[in-house]
Regions:
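Short polar/acidic secondary-structure junctions
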Residues: 210-211, 225
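Residue-level signal for secondary-structure boundary sites
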Residues: 199-201, 228, 242, 275
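Solvent-exposed strand-to-loop "edge" motifs in beta-rich extracellular domains
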Residues: 221-227, 237-239, 270-272
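Extracellular beta-strand ligand-recognition surfaces/modules
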Residues: 220, 264-282
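Short histidine-centered beta-strand/loop micro-motifs
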Residues: 204, 209, 277-279
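Bulky hydrophobic segments
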Residues: 1-100, 106-198, 206-210, 216-219, ...
Length: 282
């Protein structure tokens, strides 16, 4: 029912090679968005191989089952294997199971069926077109990250001015950011920060070129719409700070009093470098 392609031992060998990567390596705290996006696509590749292996094994039977039964069996088996991986990751590394990973796993299974679907099945073309569309959607986060990372390098030393489409994704808690054109300091756009009632409400620039050698200051502008002053806490830290306890004395901290209207603020990078107690910031 399903035509077999490739070598089953090769598929099995590739699966055994890829299996350890679910538990070793992978993106870390400071990993770039494109690396994270590319790593996530590994779920699709791995489970496409698993689906192809199962299809090949079923096809070797003298009387393979009907195509619908084959689809149901392989789709369910891939889901069970993916769920087992998520649970093992939770047990071995403390990871929280990720529903989007399970979705990628099933997309990999669908990809295997799209590749090895029988030519005489009347829905083959439509099925392949649908899977291709889903793959485009799955590739979009990686594509978007690559585009913005390229723009960030070209824009440097400007870290963010919100003139390009994906800059809000350089920030932590991007849902609290909304680009707008009503109140801007320069150019056509600025970002509006929606504060919450949380004790530490705000946003953090997280993805940006990290080599600031040769520059003396960090400058940014903040608009305060209120008549009364507003206190802004600015903090800058490096990977060492994150990996060694997040101590207050191990990062740069400064408070600014924002007056009504635009406030143009400057941070000395020499002070940032020397801020951690007993070391210099990377």
């Amino acid at each position: 029912m399903v035509r077999e392609g490739g070598s089953l031992p090769v598929r099995g060998g590739l699966l055994l090679t890829g299996l350890p990567f679910f538990f070793l390596g992978g993106p870390g705290y400071q990993s770039g968005r494109s690396f994270q996006g590319a790593w996530d696509l590994g779920h699709i590749l791995f489970f496409a191989l698993l689906g192809a292996l199962l299809l090949g094994l079923i096809n070797r039977r003298p009387a393979p089952p009907a195509y619908g039964r084959t689809f149901a069996f392989v789709f369910t088996a891939v889901f069970a294997a993916g769920l087992a991986v998520e649970l093992l990751q939770m047990q071995s590394g403390g990871r929280t199971p990720d529903v989007t990973d399970l979705v990628r796993n099933q997309l990999g299974c669908l990809l295997a069926f799209a590749i090895f679907a029988p030519r005489d099945w009347r829905w083959t073309r439509l099925f392949r077109a649908g899977v291709a569309g889903l793959l485009v959607l799955a590739l979009w986060p990686l594509s978007r990250s690559l585009i913005d990372e390229t723009l960030a390098v070209r824009q440097f030393p400007v870290l963010a001015d919100f003139e390009t489409p994906f800059e809000t994704r350089r920030w932590v808690h991007p849902s609290q950011l909304r680009t707008q054109t009503d109140i801007v300091r320069h150019g056509d756009r600025a970002a509006r920060v929606q504060l919450t009632t949380a004790r530490f409400s705000g946003v953090s620039l997280f993805h940006f070129p990290g080599d600031w050698r040769g520059y003396r200051s960090l400058r940014f502008s903040v608009y305060n719409p209120r008549e009364e002053p507003m206190e802004l806490n600015c903090r800058i830290h490096d990977v060492h700070h994150r990996d060694h306890g997040n101590a207050f004395q191990d990062r740069y901290n400064q408070q600014f009093q924002l007056q009504q209207g635009w406030n143009d603020l400057t941070v000395s990078l020499d002070r940032v470098r020397d801020a951690p107690r007993g070391r210099t910031m990377d």
